[in-house]
Amino acid sequence: MSSSKNTLLIGTRKGLVIYEKRSAGWEYAAEHFDGIPVSYAVSSPDNKIWWACQDHGHWGCKLHLSKDRGANWEEIEAPKYAEEDEIKDGVPASLKYLWVLQPHLNGNAEHVLVGTEPGGLFESKNAGKNFELVRGLWEHPSRKEQWFGGGRDYAGIHSIVIDKDNHDHRYVGISCAGVFETWDGGRQWEPKNKGLRADFLPDPASEVGQDPHLLVAHPVNQKVMWQQNHCGIYRSVDGANQWEDISEPNGVANFGFVITLDENDENTAWVVPAVSDEKRLAIDRALVVCRTRDGGKSWEKLTNGLPQEACYDIVYRHSMDITGDTLAFGTTTGNLYLSENQGDEWMALNHNLPMIYSVRFS
C-alpha cells in the first residue's frame, strides 16, 4: 500500500535530520539544530507545522516550530510549571525533559499536547503561545507517592492517545505510573492497568506504578490498544479496561521499548526486542524486528537486511514509524533502516547518524 508521506523527521542527539523520498529513492535532505539534542520531532496531521523538542542540557528544554517545512524555525516558550507546583512535598517542579508532543486530531494544527518529566501534561490551542498544565492529572491523588522515574529521576509522560471520535477522551502512558484515561478533556483521570505486571514492585499487580514503555491505539479501531511494557508486550481489545500479556513465552519478543501498528490491520504489530532491563543490547548481538499478524498469538523474526553479528543496537520508544507498507526505525548507535514491504526486507539509509531518539513520517 502506497503512502503520501514522503518525508522522515529524525530526532537525534546532535540535531534534526530530514530524509525525503525522491525519484531515486530515500535520500538525506537536510539537517536543523546541528549539535543540539532533539528529543522528539513530529508534524501536524495536515503537515502545516513541524515541531521539534530540544534538550539543551545545562540550558534546559526548548521548543521550536516551523510552518514552512523547516525553511524557518520559531522558538516557542516551553511549558512551565508554576512556582507552587511540587513533584513531592518540598520538591519544586520544573521542566526536566520534553518526552512527546502530540498534535490534536480536531483539524486545528496549532492544538497540541505535550508530555513532560516530571509527569506534567500540558496543552496548547494556539501553537504554543500559551501552555496550560492539565491540572486534573497533575493533582491525581496517586502522583506524589506512587509515580516515580523509570530510567530518569522523575516520572515522564511519553505517550498520548486521543480518541478520533471523542476528543475529550484521552489516554496517557507514564513511566512509572501506568496508563491513565480521561473522558472529560483532562479534569478527571483513572488508572487503566488491570492485567499488567510490574515485577519490580512489591505488588506486581499494583493499580499504579506500572511501566509502559510505549502506548499506542489502532488508528481505525481505537479500542484495540497495545503497549511495549517494561515487563512484556500487552494488548487490550476493550479500550484498556483489561490487558493481556502477548509476549513470547520462549521467544525474543518480550523486553523492548517501541511498538508500531499496521494502519489497517488491528492484529498486526512490530516490536524490536532487546535482551533485558539489565542488558540493553541486541539479543545475541543480532538486530531483529518481530512481527505478529494474529494479535500477539505468534511472532515471526524479520532479519533480512539487518546485521546478524557484532550488533549492539537497540531502538528507543519513539524511533520507529509506519506509513502504508513502509516502516522505518533508527537505533541508539545511529543506524537508520527502512522497509517498503512491512519488514520482509530492510535497507540501511545511514550507518553514521548520532544516537536516534525519534523517527516520524510526515
What role is predicted for each listed range?
Residues 1-362:
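Extracellular glycan-interacting surfaces
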